[in-house]
Amino acid sequence: MSRLNEYQVIGRNLPTESVPEPKLFRMRIFAPNTVVAKSRYWYFLQKLHKVKKASGEIVSVNIISEAKPTKVKTFGIWLRYESRSGIHNMYKEYRDVTRVGAVETMYQDLAARHRARFRSIHILKVVELEKTDDVKRQYVKQFLTKDLKFPLPHRVQKSKKLFQATAPTTFY
């Protein structure tokens, strides 16, 4: 079970006499629960479309589940984050079985490399890269070769005695 979920939040301005059916705004937001998802929705909506929570309403909040959660996919993530030295745009690629898993890895990666917290990271776009030509980063390309083999270091013998007179060595 992952820490985050992907939510689709749809909201709008409150209806008035001049605008009886206001425009709907939809966002896909990664958050641990619906409360945080709604909060992030209003934060981004106020910045993008000048719609405040006091003069708006949320129409629906739905959780989005992965279509194929057993297939390994490559995801490209466009993001911007606020650091101590300013705002930075970034593009990163991750291999995972779900979008949520890739985004979680991205949050951990940015926390480790750049000391960026959840609140200061804004995800702009998450895209599944279906063609291998679309993959830009070498650290992901190395796993896309045809006959990929991994070394098997530090192997242990298969048949072991029940009792052994000497301490076992693990270097073969």
UniProtKB/Swiss-Prot annotation:
Alphabetical keyword list: Cytoplasm, Ribonucleoprotein, Ribosomal protein
Top-level taxon of the source organism: Eukaryota
Annotated Gene Ontology cellular component terms: cell surface; cytosolic large ribosomal subunit
An example molecular function term from Gene Ontology annotations: structural constituent of ribosome
Disulfide bridge positions per record: none
One Gene Ontology term from the biological process aspect of the record: cytoplasmic translation
Compartmental location: Cytoplasm
Alphabetical list of InterPro entries matching this protein: Ribosomal_eL20, Ribosomal_eL20_dom, Ribosomal_eL20_eukaryotes
Main location: cytoplasm
Assembly, per entry: Component of the large ribosomal subunit. Mature ribosomes consist of a small (40S) and a large (60S) subunit. The 40S subunit contains about 32 different proteins and 1 molecule of RNA (18S). The 60S subunit contains 45 different proteins and 3 molecules of RNA (25S, 5.8S and 5S).
Family under the similarity heading: Belongs to the eukaryotic ribosomal protein eL20 family.
Function: Component of the ribosome, a large ribonucleoprotein complex responsible for the synthesis of proteins in the cell. The small ribosomal subunit (SSU) binds messenger RNAs (mRNAs) and translates the encoded message by selecting cognate aminoacyl-transfer RNA (tRNA) molecules. The large subunit (LSU) contains the ribosomal catalytic site termed the peptidyl transferase center (PTC), which catalyzes the formation of peptide bonds, thereby polymerizing the amino acids delivered by tRNAs into a polypeptide chain.
Protein name, per record: Large ribosomal subunit protein eL20
Gene name, Swiss-Prot/TrEMBL: RPL20B
